């Protein structure tokens, strides 16, 4: 299993890029090969996912570990294959996608190729509440218009702002904040995961 490759980007096509490392050219399928255009002719680090079938072994490439993580999560959804998962994250911005999943916005999800209403609902069913690992590092937090975070620890405040950005209401958050406040010394990620578990009970 490969984790990443470092080498020169020698070729860019509409479907894949070629990275040369150790005098071997690796064909790597990416969601948006042209996002690597600025790196053509220079060294790049590409995070990899190796997909094995009876008749084919393919390498899928990503510019961040967050993209790869989301890709693997999408593959776990019934009806989503590698090409569909890649098309979903091809924009390179995972925040709107995660927000749509957490807020159950199936209309947004059906905008992606090969994602119909049924598949969109399946994505929400399988992944809602399971993407907290990506949330904290990817979402840009905005100061809230209410005092919901007043008096909270910096870690819990960051978690609450992340959940607000994902579409959870003040009413929903006020129900779980007292329970979260009882847990000391948790990271933002840990608070987010705990809050999602409490709100889905």
From Swiss-Prot:
GO terms for cellular component: cytoplasm; Holliday junction helicase complex; Holliday junction resolvase complex. It is found in: Cytoplasm. Gene3D superfamilies: 5' to 3' exonuclease, C-terminal subdomain, DNA helicase RuvA subunit, C-terminal domain, Nucleic acid-binding proteins. Residues 143-153 are annotated as: Flexible linker. InterPro entries: DNA_helicase_Holl-junc_RuvA_I (IPR013849), Hlx-hairpin-Hlx_DNA-bd_motif (IPR003583), NA-bd_OB-fold (IPR012340), RuvA (IPR000085), RuvA_2-like (IPR010994), RuvA_C (IPR011114), RuvA_C_sf (IPR036267). GO terms for molecular function: ATP binding; four-way junction DNA binding; four-way junction helicase activity. Residues 153-201 are annotated as: Domain III. Residues 64-142 are annotated as: Domain II. GO terms for biological process: DNA recombination; DNA repair. Pfam families: HHH_5, RuvA_C, RuvA_N. The RuvA-RuvB-RuvC complex processes Holliday junction (HJ) DNA during genetic recombination and DNA repair, while the RuvA-RuvB complex plays an important role in the rescue of blocked DNA replication forks via replication fork reversal (RFR). RuvA specifically binds to HJ cruciform DNA, conferring on it an open structure. The RuvB hexamer acts as an ATP-dependent pump, pulling dsDNA into and through the RuvAB complex. HJ branch migration allows RuvC to scan DNA until it finds its consensus sequence, where it cleaves and resolves the cruciform DNA. NCBIfam families: ruvA. This is Holliday junction branch migration complex subunit RuvA. It comes from Listeria welshimeri serovar 6b (strain ATCC 35897 / DSM 20650 / CCUG 15529 / CIP 8149 / NCTC 11857 / SLCC 5334 / V8).
